[in-house]
Amino acid sequence: MRNCKMARVASVLGLVMLSVALLILSLISYVSLKKENIFTTPKYASPGAPRMYMFHAGFRSQFALKFLDPSFVPITNSLTQELQEKPSKWKFNRTAFLHQRQEILQHVDVIKNFSLTKNSVRIGQLMHYDYSSHKYVFSISNNFRSLLPDVSPIMNKHYNICAVVGNSGILTGSQCGQEIDKSDFVFRCNFAPTEAFQRDVGRKTNLTTFNPSILEKYYNNLLTIQDRNNFFLSLKKLDGAILWIPAFFFHTSATVTRTLVDFFVEHRGQLKVQLAWPGNIMQHVNRYWKNKHLSPKRLSTGILMYTLASAICEEIHLYGFWPFGFDPNTREDLPYHYYDKKGTKFTTKWQESHQLPAEFQLLYRMHGEGLTKLTLSHCA
């Protein structure tokens, strides 16, 4: 008798725990629908769909699995419809864009701060770092100064339509390559590869950023002849493009920067790449975006490139800006980068420094206002 009672109690407790778990999950989905999200007010085809839609769409994201923050996750039927219609409906608001450009230029002299020049620094001058303690310094050497341009590489440059290409996995299968290559000027981020992905990301590169840490991660700090050859061949493919090297963000880049300087001096005249070495630009850029209620530890490279593009481009189109682990068009899982190996899980390491969902929310709003065209759907 006693065993039967205990079994019944255990059964009841199990049902209670299951009910509580289901209630919590239901509340999560319900609250997410009530909260103002980053897109639009959702519309669903049938009663009861919102809750299940949240589970199937939201929980596909590794971001959601880890943080259970539904405000960033729901991909609704209305957004799917919007993605299909917006490319043809989007209209450039030139007046609003020019106003934004003026606002940016009030905070950032983009042309001047785009790169240090031979005339802007002297040998022995101590440079500080944007994101490191003021005690850390980098001394300008003769070799470093010799690599600086005589004038800003974007002085007196103007382009009609520019593409700023992020590295999000949303570009996988997008077939946006031809559209990107039709742009007058193409910005790329972090030396991202294009050769094996041309159908989706294009091949044209007019500028790519190069965080010094890339040398450690992909080229073994140039420690072997093979490493040096690989790096040389990668640079050769740029063929006249600007290599924008933010050497003064972190003091941890100092040693790698010196390795880079030695390499470029050694191969002087053998590469057509244009070198650009920005100084302490971020204090100015951060000030502008802070006024737009965006103040993470660090802005993403993508939004930094948008800032630079605003000074020389008459219209800016964005590709590969999507910080979530699922495709809004197909509901399929996505890698973090389009060039990640197949099966690579979506990473959330960026969360330590960046506010990518908040950046995306702002860019999406700018898209709606006609300031920039944000491509989230497939191009063909």
UniProtKB/Swiss-Prot annotation:
The active site is at 354 (proton donor/acceptor). CMP-N-acetyl-beta-neuraminate binds at residues 167, 190, 300-302, 322, 336-337. Disulfide bonds join 162-313, 176-379. The keyword Glycosyltransferase applies. GO terms for molecular function: alpha-N-acetylneuraminate alpha-2,8-sialyltransferase activity; identical protein binding; sialic acid binding. Autopolysialylated. Keywords: Disulfide bond, Glycoprotein, Glycosyltransferase, Golgi apparatus, Membrane, Signal-anchor, Transferase, Transmembrane, Transmembrane helix. The chain crosses the membrane at residues 10-33. Its EC number is 2.4.3.-, 2.4.3.8. It catalyses: [N-acetyl-alpha-D-neuraminosyl-(2->8)](n) + CMP-N-acetyl-beta-neuraminate = [N-acetyl-alpha-D-neuraminosyl-(2->8)](n+1) + CMP + H(+); alpha-Neu5Ac-(2->3)-beta-D-Gal-(1->4)-6S-D-GlcNAc + CMP-N-acetyl-beta-neuraminate = alpha-Neu5Ac-(2->8)-alpha-Neu5Ac-(2->3)-beta-D-Gal-(1->4)-6S-D-GlcNAc + CMP + H(+); a ganglioside GM3 (d18:1(4E)) + CMP-N-acetyl-beta-neuraminate = a ganglioside GD3 (d18:1(4E)) + CMP + H(+); a ganglioside GM3 + CMP-N-acetyl-beta-neuraminate = a ganglioside GD3 + CMP + H(+). PANTHER family: ALPHA-2,8-SIALYLTRANSFERASE (PTHR11987), SIA-ALPHA-2,3-GAL-BETA-1,4-GLCNAC-R:ALPHA 2,8-SIALYLTRANSFERASE (PTHR11987:SF36). Belongs to the glycosyltransferase 29 family. Catalyzes the transfer of sialic acid from a CMP-linked sialic acid donor onto a terminal alpha-2,3-, alpha-2,6-, or alpha-2,8-linked sialic acid of an acceptor, such as N-linked oligosaccharides of glycoproteins and glycolipids through alpha-2,8-linkages. Forms oligosialic and polysialic acid on various sialylated N-acetyllactosamine oligosaccharides of glycoproteins, including FETUB N-glycans, a2-HS-glycoprotein (AHSG) and alpha 2,3-sialylated glycosphingolipids, such as alpha 2,3-sialylparagloboside and ganglioside GM3 and to a lesser extent NCAM1 N-glycans. This is Alpha-N-acetylneuraminate alpha-2,8-sialyltransferase ST8SIA3.
